[in-house]
């Protein structure tokens, strides 16, 4: 029996395009195991796939396939939604996500991928442990930067006295793409240089 691609990606390590050499041109992450690890560390995962006018669903329980991929209805657009419940037996300290931590990462991803639109919905409310012990209200934040890393440099230098407009250049060959943006300011900081590979901060 042929296993659907979505099931392979969620249950087998190194099954992503990063290891095929020609799977995709741009990737995010380091090891190519991300979503399969999320599945392994979750008590439950639901995946909905919309394509070719139909919607499909597959369910997982503690990393194992619970319900095979099956059609559940019609779809008027394409896309994939992954919903996961972190396993409290593994993450004994907490399974509560901090809004500010997630927002910072999504903002960074939007800066690094020019034009990418990330919409963050936090539907939690009246839960004392959600945000640093303060009650949270439902909120939505959209991250999209058409200037890419030029906008990132401007964001990092907000409030500083800058000496020039951001300088930007890029280069591309068969092995990949390099982008550089820089701007001088009157302030000094040891964190003034940042580097990323596959959208990951290399510190």
Enumerate the predicted regions with their spans.
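Short glycine-rich loop/turn motifs
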Residues: 6, 79, 177-181
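GHKL-type ATPase core
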Residues: 1-5, 16-147
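GHKL/Histidine-kinase-like ATPase module
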Residues: 100, 108-109, 115, 119-203
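Short basic (Lys/Arg) and small-residue
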Residues: 9
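Mobile ATP-lid/nucleotide-binding loop of the nucleotide-binding subdomain
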Residues: 12-13
């Amino acid at each position: 029996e042929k296993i659907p691609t979505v099931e392979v990606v969620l249950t087998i390590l190194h099954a992503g395009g990063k290891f095929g050499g020609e799977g995709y041109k741009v990737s995010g992450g380091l090891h190519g195991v991300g979503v399969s690890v999320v599945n392994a560390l979750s008590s439950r995962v639901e995946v909905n796939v919309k394509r070719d006018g139909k919607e499909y669903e597959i369910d997982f329980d503690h990393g194992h396939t619970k319900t095979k991929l099956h059609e559940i209805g019609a779809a008027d657009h394409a896309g994939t939604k992954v919903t996961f419940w972190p396993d409290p037996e593994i993450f004994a300290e907490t399974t509560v996500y901090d809004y500010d931590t997630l927002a910072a990462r999504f903002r960074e991803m939007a800066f690094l991928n020019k034009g990418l639109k990330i919409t963050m919905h936090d539907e939690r409310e009246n839960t004392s442990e959600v945000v640093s012990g303060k009650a949270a209200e439902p909120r939505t934040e959209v991250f999209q930067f058409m200037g890419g890393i030029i906008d990132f440099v401007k964001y990092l230098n907000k409030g500083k006295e800058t000496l020039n407009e951001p300088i930007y250049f890029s280069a591309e060959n068969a092995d990949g793409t390099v982008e550089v943006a820089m701007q001088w300011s009157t302030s000094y900081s040891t964190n003034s240089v940042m580097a990323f590979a596959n959208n990951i901060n290399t510190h």
